[in-house]
């Protein structure tokens, strides 16, 4: 008899047909913000897609009640997440210093990566920026995890306003956000910039991770590896569809050629799960999260994930 398990996840092609051995999934497809809010606040499902930033924050606390597995359903390069007001005069990353910059949440994964690359690739001093926190399009968004901000960094909460409104009215000079708040991108032609960044660093930013509620994991620890294997199999079929030239599996022209070119750069498995294929990205993220006060200490990558998923048997 299979184990019944509830899972909240976005409707990804690479999770299509997900059938982990020994598990009957009850899948809930929700908008990302609702999913993260409900799982962070109420732990409504046995397993959930989760913000990587919030995950490392929770894992840095004593006795965390979640257990991540190294499945990364969403990855996005984040040079494209930096937006500037049209009349701000900001032309380079260093121009952000001394300016008012909005964020939806300091612990938003996209922002952690963007601030990390601004700091480490372009020499931007985060403490020299005036940070303002608000919802992207709606007032009232709040931080959902505990922060230990680095020296010199302060954040002004703006609960009655939105980032989009403040950017449009000139009350903010820039916004770092996973969603478009308006304005223009600092890196206007961002694709070649992000491609060179990947070639240089091998960092392919991980946005989301799959986590289990700890009581669910502790009761049946085998589900961690079975879920990982199930996700890997679903992803393998998705990647085959992406490079298929005989059919249009996704309504986008030249998709197979785009996938072929990306595979030439990133390797045969161009969307890897597991720890070792993602080590440059994972090490960079735990460093950024600690430097920016999302975690009070730098986490060890291996300590983030269920032990059963850290190694494989060999014949």
Locations of the language-model features?
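Short helix-initiation/N-cap motifs at beta->coil->alpha
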Residues: 27-38, 91, 129-165, 300-310
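Short low-complexity, flexible loop/linker segments enriched in glycine and/or proline
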Residues: 63-65, 185-190, 311-314
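Short, glycine-/small- and polar/acidic-enriched structural segments
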Residues: 6-9, 13-127, 131-138
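Secondary-structure end/capping motifs
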Residues: 211, 217-291
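Long, low-complexity C-terminal extensions of enzymes
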Residues: 274-315
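Basic/polar N-terminal segments that are highly enriched at the extreme N-terminus
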Residues: 1-3
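Pocket-lining segment of extracytoplasmic ligand-binding domains
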Residues: 142-243
């Amino acid at each position: 008899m299979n184990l019944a398990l509830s899972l909240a996840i976005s409707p990804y092609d690479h999770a299509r047909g997900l059938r982990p051995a020994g598990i009957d999934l009850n899948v809930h497809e929700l908008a990302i913000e609702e999913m993260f809010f409900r799982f962070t606040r109420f732990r409504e499902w046995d397993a959930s897609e989760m913000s990587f930033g919030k995950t490392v924050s929770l894992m840095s606390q004593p006795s965390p009640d979640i257990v991540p597995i190294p499945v990364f359903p969403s990855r996005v390069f984040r040079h494209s997440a930096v937006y500037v007001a049209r009349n701000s005069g900001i032309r380079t990353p260093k121009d952000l210093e001394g300016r008012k910059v909005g964020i939806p949440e300091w612990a938003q994964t996209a922002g952690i990566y963007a601030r990390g690359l601004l700091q480490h690739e372009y020499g931007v001093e985060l403490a020299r920026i005036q940070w303002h926190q608000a919802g992207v399009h709606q007032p009232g968004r709040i931080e959902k995890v505990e922060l230990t901000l680095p020296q010199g960094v302060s954040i002004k909460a703006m609960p009655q306003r939105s980032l989009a409104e403040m950017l449009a009215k000139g009350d903010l000079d820039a916004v770092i956000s996973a969603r478009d708040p308006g304005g223009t991108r600092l890196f206007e032609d961002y694709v070649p910039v992000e491609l060179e960044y990947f070639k240089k660093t091998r960092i392919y930013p991980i946005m989301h991770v799959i986590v289990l509620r700890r009581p669910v994991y502790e009761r049946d620890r085998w589900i961690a590896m079975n879920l990982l294997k199930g996700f890997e199999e679903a992803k393998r079929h998705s990647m085959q569809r992406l490079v298929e030239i005989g059919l249009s599996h996704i309504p986008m022209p030249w998709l197979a050629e785009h996938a072929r070119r990306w595979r030439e750069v990133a390797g045969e498995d161009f969307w890897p799960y597991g720890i070792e294929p993602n080590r440059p990205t994972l090490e960079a993220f735990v460093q950024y999260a600690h430097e920016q006060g999302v975690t009070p200490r730098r986490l060890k990558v291996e300590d983030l994930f269920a032990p059963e998923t850290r190694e494989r048997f060999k014949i």
